[in-house]
Each structure stands twice: as C-alpha cells, then as structure tokens.
Amino acid sequence: MSEGTVSLSGRWRLWDQVAVRGTGFPANGVLRLAPEGLAAAADKFGPRDALSGAAWKAFEEEFVRAAALAAADAQEIAASGRFRAAVAWQNRGVLDSAIRPFLNWSPETAGRTFKQRQREELVAHYWQRFCVKNDTIGFFGPVGWGAFDTARPGVTVEPGSGPTASSEVFWSSWSVDALAREIDADPAVRPWTAPRRVPYVRLEENAVRIPARPPRPVPPETLRLLRLCDGTRSVPALQRELGPDADVPALLDELVRLRWITWRLEVPADIRPDRRLRAALERIGEPGPRAAALARMDELESAVEGVRAAAEDPERLVAALTAVEQTFQRVTEAAAKREKSTTTAPGRAVVYSDSRRAARVTLGGDVL
C-alpha cells in the first residue's frame, strides 16, 4: 500500500500524484481592466464629502480618461484570437451578437452608449473568468499534473514549453448515446445487439428471483437463454446455442417485457465512448447494415475532425462547431445541445475540448 503514496501523521496517506488546476490565460491579465490610480483617486472622497467643486471635477475628468483606456484595452483583448476561440467554446453566439459589434465600435465617434457598455462588461466578464477562475475546460482551463516529494522543501514548478502540452476534442457521452439510439432503431441492426441480463435478476435452478418478489418458475429454455444473455452474444450466437427450434427473438422480447434483460445498443461509460460504439458497430455480422451504421458515424467523425483541425483559430472553430451541430442534427434527428438544468451533467455540447498543462508541479515536505 505504501507504493505510490505519501505518509502523513497517524494512519493517513495521500496519493503521491495530484491534479493541478489553473487558468489558461495569465492571472495578472485581469489587472489590465483596473485603471492605475483610479481607485486611489476615488478614495479621497469620504461618505460625507460633497461631490462637487474642483476636486470632484478633476476626478470626473480622470474617470472619463480611465474609462476610455479601459475600453481600448477591452477591445484589444476582444480582438485576440485566443480570447475569441475560448468564447467560441463557451458561447459562440455572443461573438456575432456582442464581440463583433464591440470591435467595430469607435468610442471617439459613437460614444459609450448603454449597449456598448454592456458589451464591454461582457468582454470583462469573460476575461476575468479566463484569467482567474480555475475552470477545467479546453486550452483556457487546462489540467496539469504534479507530485508530492517529501525530499524537497517547498514548491517547485517546471513551466514546460508553452501553456499547454496537448489538447484533444472528445465526444460528449450523451451525443454518442443519441447516435446509438438512432442506429439501434434500424431493425436490421437489432439482431446484432447483444442483450444482457439486468443486475438484480438472480437465476436459480428452475426459477428467476427478483428483489421483494417470490421465485418465478420459468421453462428450461428461457432459463438457459437468460444465462446466456451476458452482453457479449448477438441473436445469431444465441440462436446457435439454443438450436434452430427456439424462437430466440420472441423469447428476448418477452424477457424485455418482464424487465429481466436489456436489449439495445448501449455504450459503456468511457472517456472515448465513440470508440466503444464503433467497436460495437464493427461486430454487426451483415455487411449492409454494418456499412450503413458506420457511414453515419464516419460522417459525424469527419465533422469532429474539422474541430480538431481548427485548434485556436476562432473563425475556423466557429465554422467547424456549427458543422458538427448541423451534422449531428441531420444524422441523429436530435437536438445538438442539451438544455442547462440541475440534472444536466457537464458537457452540454456535442463535443468538448480538454487540454493538459505543460507545467508540472512538485510539492515538498514543507507543504505537508
């Protein structure tokens, strides 16, 4: 048990590997939107001081100058390709509705209207989030790795080369499930979907027992079929086991009705659910249905490759994400984004991006 762990006092131990969370933009970048000296100038006025006179007039003039500088900084931030790419992953709709109009705005000619202040605040909101909030998302919220080493005294950081060591685009599990449901609706695919017995069904010598129910006698043929429903055998394989006289599809339909088995194309939980689905489709024994099912998946995978190729180019990324959603809707006939709610897990879009931070951190004995 001691291998791979760090001992603490008493019986406590820690795993020697740790995840390092942080932002993908420099933390001090947030100070760009804090005009130097403005807060100190405002502090000169107490709660009972009259907001008038020469001193107040000077502060108003300073505030106007600071606001103009902050707006210029916000425009420079919004023009950055990495910033717009990060926003594209979060909410690409605001790129056209807010970011683009803000970049086309000239404070010297149009003035700081309410609408432009709202857009400036939106840029500031995203910039603060990207600089100082430890989101775990894409290149603007990468996750790194570190380790405990009690032989060292403090904290050691190896910065690596660049902010991220690697980035990858993954399918959301729900989007693969939606694709599996659509493919499973094809009657030609179902015989090649392996049924499995549900976990709470217990098989006895000549009966089936489920929780809170008395044993239910079943025919030997049904009991044998239940034993064979292990999630690996297709209908043709089950038919070979039971012989030509058994009506396996009818028996399976009855077991589904009794809720003793699950008979559908299921995708196990996995960081790469698309690979699990592809492996299941490649096991379809008939060339026609197999090719048709894989063609649907290939069409979606081709669109996802476009997202990978876009990387941090905001224009290409927006086009690629749009293409993924349009392809997904056409192939699955399902919505390309899940509505946010208290029961919705992270990953509401069809695909998401994760990145690994280039830096590596070592925590020494003084930290413990």
Predicted feature residues:
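Extended, Lys/Arg-enriched charged tracts that mediate electrostatic binding to polyanionic substrates
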Residues: 140, 147-202
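Catalytic cores of large soluble enzymes that bind and process phosphate-bearing ligands
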Residues: 171, 217, 230
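Composition- and surface-driven signal marking solvent-exposed, interaction-prone regions
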Residues: 169, 240-241, 249-253
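Type-3 copper protein
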Residues: 1-163, 220-221, 228, 247-368
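Short acidic (Asp/Glu) and glycine-rich catalytic loops that position anionic groups and cofactors
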Residues: 204-206, 232-236, 278-281, 355
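A general structural signal for short secondary-structure junctions and capping/turn motifs
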Residues: 189-193, 215, 253
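Short alpha-helical segments that sit at the start of domains
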Residues: 194-224
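Short capping segments at the starts of secondary-structure elements
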Residues: 226-237, 241, 245
